[in-house]
């Protein structure tokens, strides 16, 4: 084993470094190389770094005595490596360093004597030693190959047939090798010299055509050296084979130092990939060598990451003697690159190679290859494939299964491996004479190719290398890389010499290729020794930097540039000789000789830029001046802005100071009052300073508003969740690290009847909010319990669940931290703490009871007032509103004659006192039949605009169908109690717990406990009953007699309050295994209209340009508009156009669809906005389109800050479209969407089966007269298929319907409501208060967070989930109360009313029931032109309604409306009174819609069957709107409307629009409150939307007679009118009922 020999060589300064006056930072002393950091002060510890290598060559200054020449480098490294090759070892020498560091000079050198590099010198010395030592017993053979690695592609430089890229294979015996790479036999150094020259020519041609240079490619020159020695004594022939690999690496590129851009930047990236991989390999090998002992697991070395390291695998740490020459620059401007090179070289010293003598390699290799070929033939024969040898030696493969489309992958691999092995064995069996013959053939082919290209050749046919003709004019190539310059020479013969490409119709004498070279580019005319260049039309030809269009006479030394990359120097030997002899002082033809500059490639390029008007220095100075001016301008703007801000802050400070002074003056006035003054009648609130003249109605409204404000608490709950999330994360992290089986998560708890809070979780009331002992506030109302944030502790070890307050969490967290710090002091033999976990000593655990709460039930006692017995079947409900079973309870009064009978099943008796003082101390919250809207503690459950009178009306009429029952029973309850409830007497009643049913089998030992709400300490309990789980009822049959002295408080309790029943059971199974299953089996699903949509309406994606979204304004809504938006995702088609991707509308849901995309294709997102024309809404342009929230589930993540996939798309300007025949406003814009920039695997890969991808896009649009951008947000779902996959649906439904043939069907619709609010500078105080910023600590890092595997504390979504639970509890409570009242009413015989229900009441009730099935209820008031009385007259005669009937009719009307009526109907009113207006606040600014039609003298309407319409007819149109077009600033709000999935009616209608050309048959779908118009029933895209909430519907016989079209009715919106005709007479009423149920009922 031997280490890699490492040498470092420093070159002289180049012209660039001299021009920049660089300083030398390299010093060498012996084998030590020192580098000085120019950025660090001299003398510091980090200023100088020292490295020791095997050799350090000082080649900086030739005048130095220690200057190292090429010969010295070769004598130290080359001779040693050559000796190793004669010994039979593999040898490798490679040069490493940055671009321009001198690698190519060290390896190749120059043609002058003494300037040869390592490669020519080692080849020359090789053949010298061969000639000296060759004899009859010792024979030598040498073969060479020359390849180039560019951008991970391998090219053969010696064989012109191998024009393409060669494959790199790996053989188990040979290792990595290049397939079909030419290995040419050579017999002398001159042969190698010529092959190197030929290879450089091929490299030059390819580099010129591809615009490359050698510094961007790796060159590998390999010599295969074979020694055959004949042993005369044994007559045995031994063979040694060594491989000499000479590598010239590409320079390491730095984009900022080389100025690389575009393609050059990509080339540099590929070069750096190879060099980076080489560095990784060197580091890995050095690390392995530095280890003391070999690791058990083999270390991974990334050889395969690049072609270069793969081919050099044996030379790096393998079977090779390797030397590395690190070339460095001495300049300080290259400090970073030089230091990196030195570090790589230092690491390479540690690499250990295991070189062995390659003796008798061929014999062993041939034998093993033959065995491998035989095995492969047997394998193919077993597969039914025979390999036969043809007449020409070619292997022919015969397979009986040719008709199969494809064979197995194993068979194909075997055939491929067989062919590769046979190529190798044929190459090894080739004799030396055959190799020489093949080499000569390749040389002839190569010369022919060069001659065909026009490269000059000698008389013997050999191409010209470094040779200058004496007479003939010629062109010599110039290249950016000096090693490739002057390699190619092209003669210009007498007469015409054509130059072009090989594809020209006329054969070209000089053939070039590459960009901007025409088929016939130009012609050189050589006449009488004068060469004229004649360019063809549109050909790029430059002479001495000037573009040539007309014929140009060339002078010797002229620089000729053809196309973009081909640079030549024209030379005329005779002309140059004459000029020199005639006058040497004349500057001929702008040659640069006099100026001392060399006419190389750089000179030609600079000359081109200068002559074409591109002066680099002038451009740089101009750019510097522009930057300086920009800096001054920005500095002035910044200073001005700073001055304005300073003045603003000073003004704000003055205003605050003035405010403080005013407050201090006011408080000084109060200081004159004594404390006794405030306890007298002259209170501060009746002080003249605070006197307010409020009426009783205003005071009541203020009290209602104050109570409503107190019940809103979403913001405080969110603050608690955000502020304590970091504590929750830390507790979970400690729990995981200490291996505690406890998990903590936020939850919300509200003190309700079904979920009472323990005292430690009850939130403290606000200071001053409660009076009278904390029971009632100043308004005489009991406060609704506030919702509190708690921590749900899931103890999976003990199978229990606890709830902690936030304060308890912080206290326990301190103990957890202490336990965590003490954990390190415990030894492995420390005892387990299971005892502490059970006794409560461990801060992670709490004590848990044996029995667990199953649920609660409530039984009302109103039947005891009458007195009658009742048997109740009540639901057992848990804390989350889930029904866990049912309980049967009997409640009956015990009269005097029954008191003595205790033998009939009576188990227990008790006596309870209901005295007034005790009841006052334990007053329970008042339970209403239906809570008032102002007392409903579910935030957001009521309307702000509801009037106080309507709230008072709600107390008497809940609108839910139970008011009549409650009112009748309340009237009875308000009467004097019966004789059995006379105050002072004792009253006994009996509560019998009969049975429990439906309780899950997981609960064992069930028992029931009940008590009065205010007497928790006096509870009655049954005996436990075994729950077998068979489904049979659990019989308790527990009888409890209760005797109570009758008081007013007891009577009040019987009227309003229930008894609570608590059912307990021992939970015998582990909760984590059964809870989830139990929840899924028993939990009732919420009603359909309460469920969240499958794809929720997301909040806008945060824009990088606009920052966080501002708070929504609370100012007045000035106008509302309905907006229809179409979304399309377009993909690049083969014809170059962007075609909309297929959208699958198979789910038949409104505004829903699934985009079917292809992988790896360019896409664009196209959005079209459609709305009615209005002067208020004018789109200016699209400001930004943001795409983010990439996910595979419909709901986005709670934490938006962690979304790293947000991408702002490149925008195209928006445009206003004009659609023929449609006068609506259309605004469309597009954005380029490169989904790979999201760096999301979901968008990069093909979507898995059954999976869908969801994204959220937000478009920020600018409108006229709007202070903020309008934001359109939409969630899109998609599936990504393979690039060539067909995305069209394959179902028979779509096959026969042809739904997807129309490209306009491939779009997704969205319905939005645009609200324009008045812009406010400061906003209301509520807005300012809501703008406070609370830090969300859920994303703050906590030590150990990575162990949580992505777990996050719950956020805002928890509040909405809790709202649904509270809604369920409220409904269960209401249902239980109403069920009790109905049961009591039936028991009392109150169902037989004296006045039976009339037919009118039945019709109205049926109408209300049918209308309530629709999810949205809206009433469209009839037009004054169509009185209701006239339409109702034919249906039934008018009659006077009683008060009772009037109340019933009015309640049904409110049921249809779905909200409270706007105007209370008086007792004397009739059913045909004027209805209240339904206009929203946003509609107040709009003019009333005029539904009247044209006068009777208008032209008749044609029927829908007639095609041509009269020009004079006008459809029903709204009245002209008088808008104030003065400049007003608005704040736009675009909110997506979730369209109801319920279809009220769908079918074909004939539609006539205002201003339309005629009747059109359209498919119409009614999803209240919207009507969608489609082109046909197969059209999945909504083309138009009508909002029934703001429309007016009319249908009358007068209207039909006037338009002379039967079966018609009109729909008039704010902007246009529609006339609709049904296809049949019977459908008119059904359509009217679907659109306007009240109007249909009136006409009926």
Swiss-Prot record:
It comes from Anopheles gambiae. GO terms for biological process: retrograde neuronal dense core vesicle transport; synaptic vesicle transport; vesicle transport along microtubule; vesicle-mediated transport. Residues 358-434, 611-670 form a coiled coil. The lineage of its organism: Eukaryota, Metazoa, Ecdysozoa, Arthropoda, Hexapoda. It is found in: Cytoplasm, Cytoskeleton. Residues 398-407 have a biased composition (Basic residues). Residues 391-412, 952-984 are annotated as: Disordered. Residues 497-563 form the FHA domain. This is Kinesin-like protein unc-104. Belongs to the TRAFAC class myosin-kinesin ATPase superfamily. Kinesin family. Unc-104 subfamily. Keywords: ATP-binding, Coiled coil, Cytoplasm, Cytoskeleton, Microtubule, Motor protein, Nucleotide-binding. GO terms for cellular component: axon cytoplasm; cytoplasm; kinesin complex; microtubule; microtubule associated complex. CDD domains: FHA_KIF1, KISc_KIF1A_KIF1B, PH_KIFIA_KIFIB. InterPro entries: FHA_dom (IPR000253), Kinesin-like (IPR022164), Kinesin-like_KIF1-typ (IPR022140), Kinesin_assoc (IPR032405), Kinesin_motor_CS (IPR019821), Kinesin_motor_dom (IPR001752), Kinesin_motor_dom_sf (IPR036961), P-loop_NTPase (IPR027417). It comes from the Eukaryota. SUPFAM superfamilies: P-loop containing nucleoside triphosphate hydrolases, PH domain-like, SMAD/FHA domain. ATP binds at residues 97-104.
């Amino acid at each position: 084993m031997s280490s890699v020999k490492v040498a470092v060589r420093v070159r002289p300064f180049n012209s660039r470094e001299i021009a920049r006056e660089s300083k030398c930072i390299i010093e060498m002393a012996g084998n030590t190389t020192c580098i000085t950091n120019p950025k660090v002060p001299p003398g510091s510890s980090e200023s100088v770094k020292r490295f020791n290598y095997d050799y350090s060559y000082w080649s900086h200054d030739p005048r130095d005595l220690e200057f190292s020449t090429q010969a010295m480098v070769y004598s130290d490294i080359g001779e040693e490596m050559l000796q190793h090759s004669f010994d039979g070892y593999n040898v490798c020498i490679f040069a490493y360093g940055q671009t321009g560091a001198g690698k190519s000079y060290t390896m190749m050198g120059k043609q002058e004597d003494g300037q040869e590099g390592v490669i020519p010198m080692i080849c020359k010395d090789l053949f010298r030693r061969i000639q000296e030592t060759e004899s009859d017993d010792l024979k030598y053979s040498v073969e060479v190959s020359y390849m180039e690695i560019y951008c991970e592609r391998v090219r053969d430089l010696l064989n012109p047939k191998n024009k393409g890229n060669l494959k790199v294979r790996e053989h188990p015996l040979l290792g990595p090798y290049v397939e079909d790479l030419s290995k040419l036999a050579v017999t002398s150094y001159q042969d190698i010299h010529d092959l190197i020259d030929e290879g450089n020519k091929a490299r030059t041609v390819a580099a010129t055509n591809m615009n490359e240079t050698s510094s961007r490619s790796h060159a590998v020159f390999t010599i295969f050296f074979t020694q055959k020695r004949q042993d005369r004594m044994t007559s045995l022939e031994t063979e040694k084979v060594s491989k000499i690999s000479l590598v010239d690496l590409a320079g390491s590129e730095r984009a900022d130092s080389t100025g690389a851009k575009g393609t050059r930047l990509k080339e540099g990236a590929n070069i750096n990939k190879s060099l980076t991989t080489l560095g990784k390999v060197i580091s890995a090998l050095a690390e392995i060598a530095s280890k003391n002992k070999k690791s058990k697991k083999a270390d991974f070395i990334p050889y395969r990451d690049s072609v270069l390291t793969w081919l050099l695998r044996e030379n790096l740490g393998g079977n090779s003697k390797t030397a590395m020459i690190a070339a460095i620059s001495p300049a300080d401007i290259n400090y970073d690159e030089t230091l990196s090179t030195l570090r790589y070289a230092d690491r390479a010293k540690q690499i250990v190679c295991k070189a062995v003598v390659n003796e008798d390699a061929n014999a062993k290799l041939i034998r093993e290859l033959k065995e491998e070929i035989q095995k492969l033939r047997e394998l193919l024969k077993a597969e039914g494939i025979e390999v036969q040898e043809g007449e020409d030696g070619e292997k022919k493969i015969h397979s009986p299964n040719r008709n199969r489309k494809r064979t197995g992958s194993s068979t194909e691999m075997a055939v491929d491996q067989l062919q590769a092995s046979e190529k190798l064995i044929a190459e090894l069996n080739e004799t030396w004479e055959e190799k020489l013959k093949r080499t000569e053939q390749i040389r002839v082919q190569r010369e022919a190719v060069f001659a065909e290209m026009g490269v000059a050749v000698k008389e013997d046919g050999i191409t010209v290398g470094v040779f200058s003709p004496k007479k003939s004019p010629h062109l010599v190539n110039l290249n950016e890389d000096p090693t490739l310059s002057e390699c190619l020479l092209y003669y210009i013969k007498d007469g015409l010499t054509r130059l072009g490409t090989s594809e020209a119709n006329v054969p070209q004498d000089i053939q070039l290729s590459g960009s901007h070279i025409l088929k016939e580019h130009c012609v050189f005319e050589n006449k009488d020794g004068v060469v004229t260049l004649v360019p063809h039309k549109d050909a790029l030809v430059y002479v001495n930097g000037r573009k040539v269009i007309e014929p140009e006479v060339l002078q010797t030394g002229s620089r000729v540039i053809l196309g973009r990359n081909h640079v030549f120097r024209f030379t005329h030997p005779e002309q140059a000789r004459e000029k020199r002899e005639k006058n040497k002082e004349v500057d001929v033809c702008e040659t640069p000789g006099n100026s001392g500059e060399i006419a190389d490639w750089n000179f030609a390029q600079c000359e081109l830029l200068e002559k074409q008007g591109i002066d680099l220095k002038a451009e740089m100075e101009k750019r510097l001046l522009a930057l300086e001016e920009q800096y001054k301008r920005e500095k002035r703007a910044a200073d001005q802005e700073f001055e304005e801000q300073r003045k603003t802050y000073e003004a704000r400070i003055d205003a605050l100071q003035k405010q403080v002074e005013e407050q201090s003056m006011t408080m000084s006035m109060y200081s004159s009052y004594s404390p006794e003054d405030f306890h007298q009648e002259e209170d501060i609130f009746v002080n003249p300073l605070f006197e307010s003249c409020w009426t009783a109605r205003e005071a009541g409204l203020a009290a209602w508003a104050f109570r409503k404000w107190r019940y809103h608490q979403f913001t405080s709950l969110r603050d608690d969740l955000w502020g304590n999330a970091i504590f929750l994360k830390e507790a979970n992290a400690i729990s995981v690290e200490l291996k505690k089986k406890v998990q903590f998560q936020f939850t919300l708890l509200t003190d309700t009847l079904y979920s009472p809070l323990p005292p430690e979780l009850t939130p403290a009331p606000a200071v001053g909010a409660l009076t009278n002992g904390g029971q009632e506030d100043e308004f005489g109302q009991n406060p609704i319990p506030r919702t509190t944030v708690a921590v749900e502790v899931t103890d999976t070890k003990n199978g229990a669940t606890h709830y902690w307050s936030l304060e308890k969490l912080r206290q326990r967290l301190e103990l957890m931290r202490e336990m965590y710090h003490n954990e390190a002091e415990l030894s492995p033999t420390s005892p387990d703490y299971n005892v502490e976990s059970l006794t409560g000593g461990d801060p992670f655990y709490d004590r848990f009871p044996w029995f667990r709460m199953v649920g609660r039930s409530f039984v009302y006692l109103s039947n005891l007032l009458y007195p009658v017995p009742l048997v109740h079947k009540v639901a057992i409900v848990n804390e989350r509103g889930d029904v866990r079973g049912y309980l049967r309870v009997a409640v009956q009064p015990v009269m005097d004659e029954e008191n003595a009978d205790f033998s009939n099943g009576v188990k227990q008796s008790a006596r309870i006192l209901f005295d007034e003082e005790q009841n006052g101390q334990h007053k329970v919250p008042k339970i209403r039949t239906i809570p008032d809207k102002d007392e409903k503690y579910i935030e957001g459950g009521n309307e702000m605009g509801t009037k106080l009178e309507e709230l008072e009306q709600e107390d008497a009429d809940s609108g839910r169908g139970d008011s009549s029952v409650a009112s009748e029973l309340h009237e009875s309850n308000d009467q004097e109690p019966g004789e059995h409830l006379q105050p002072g007497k004792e009253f006994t009643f009996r509560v019998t717990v009969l049975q429990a049913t439906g309780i899950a089998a997981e609960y064992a030992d069930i028992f029931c406990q009940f008590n009065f709400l205010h007497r928790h300490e006096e509870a009655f309990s049954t005996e436990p009953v075994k729950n077998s789980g068979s489904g049979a009822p659990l019989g308790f049959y527990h009888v409890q007699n209760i005797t109570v002295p009758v008081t007013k408080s007891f009577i009040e309790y019987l009227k309003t309050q229930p008894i609570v029943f608590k059912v307990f059971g021992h939970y015998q199974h582990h909760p984590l295994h059964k809870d989830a299953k139990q929840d899924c089996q028993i939990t009732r699903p919420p009603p359909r209209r309460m469920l969240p949509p499958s794809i929720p309406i997301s909040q806008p994606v945060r824009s990088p340009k606009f920052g966080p979204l501002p708070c929504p304004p609370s100012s007045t809504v000035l106008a509302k508009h309905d907006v229809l938006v179409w979304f399309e995702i377009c993909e690049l088609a083969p014809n170059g156009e962007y075609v909309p991707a297929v959208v699958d509308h198979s789910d038949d849901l409104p505004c829903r669809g699934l985009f079917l995309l292809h992988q790896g294709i360019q896409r664009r997102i196209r959005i079209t906005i459609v709305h009615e024309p209005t002067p208020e809404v004018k789109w200016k342009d699209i400001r930004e389109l943001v795409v983010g929230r990439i996910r595979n589930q419909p709901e986005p993540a709670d934490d938006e800050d962690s979304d790293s996939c947000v991408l702002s798309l490149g925008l195209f300007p928006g445009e206003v479209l004009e659609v023929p025949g449609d006068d609506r406003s259309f605004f469309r814009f597009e954005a380029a969407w490169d989904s790979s920039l999201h760096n999301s695997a979901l968008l990069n890969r093909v979507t898995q089966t059954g999976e869908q991808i969801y994204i959220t896009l937000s478009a920020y649009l600018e409108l006229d007269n709007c202070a903020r951008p309008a934001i359109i947000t939409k969630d899109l779902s998609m599936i990504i298929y393979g690039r060539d996959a067909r995305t069209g649906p394959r179902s028979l439904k779509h096959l026969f319907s042809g739904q997807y043939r129309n490209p306009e069907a491939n779009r997704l619709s969205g319905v939005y409501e645009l609200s324009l609010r008045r812009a406010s500078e400061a906003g209301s105080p509520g807005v300012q208060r809501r703008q406070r910023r609370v830090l969300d600590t859920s994303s703050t890092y906590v030590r150990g967070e990575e162990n949580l595997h992505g777990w996050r504390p719950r956020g805002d979504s928890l509040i909405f989930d809790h709202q649904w639970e509270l809604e369920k509890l409220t409904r269960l409570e209401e249902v239980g109360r109403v069920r009790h009242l109905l049961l009591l009413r039936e028991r009392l015989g109150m169902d037989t009313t004296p006045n039976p229900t009339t037919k009118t009441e039945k019709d109205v009730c049926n109408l209300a029931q049918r209308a309530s099935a629709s999810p949205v209820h809206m009433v469209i008031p009839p037009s004054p032109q169509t009185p209701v009385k006239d339409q109702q007259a034919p249906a039934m005669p008018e009659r006077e309604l009683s008060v009772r009937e009037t109340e019933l009719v009015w309640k049904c009307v409110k049921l249809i409306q779905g909200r409270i009526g706007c105007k209370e109907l008086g007792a004397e009113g009739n059913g045909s009174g004027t209805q209240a207006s339904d206009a929203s606040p946003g509609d107040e600014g709009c003019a009333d819609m005029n539904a009247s039609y044209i006068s009777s003298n208008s032209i008749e309407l044609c029927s829908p069957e007639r095609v041509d319409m009269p020009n004079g007819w006008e459809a029903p149109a709204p009245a002209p709107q008088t808008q104030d077009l003065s400049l007003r600033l608005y704040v736009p709000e675009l909110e997506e409307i979730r369209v109801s999935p319920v279809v009220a009616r769908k079918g074909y209608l004939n539609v006539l629009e205002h201003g339309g050309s005629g009747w059109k048959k359209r498919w119409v779908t009614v999803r209240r409150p919207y009507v969608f118009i489609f082109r046909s029933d197969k059209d999945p895209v909504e083309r138009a939307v009508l909002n029934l909430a703001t429309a007016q519907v009319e249908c009358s016989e007068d209207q039909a007679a006037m338009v002379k079209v039967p079966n018609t009715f009109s729909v008039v919106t704010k902007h246009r009118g529609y006339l609709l005709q049904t296809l049949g007479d019977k459908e008119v009423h059904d359509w009217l009922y679907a659109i306007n149920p009240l109007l249909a009922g009136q006409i009926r």
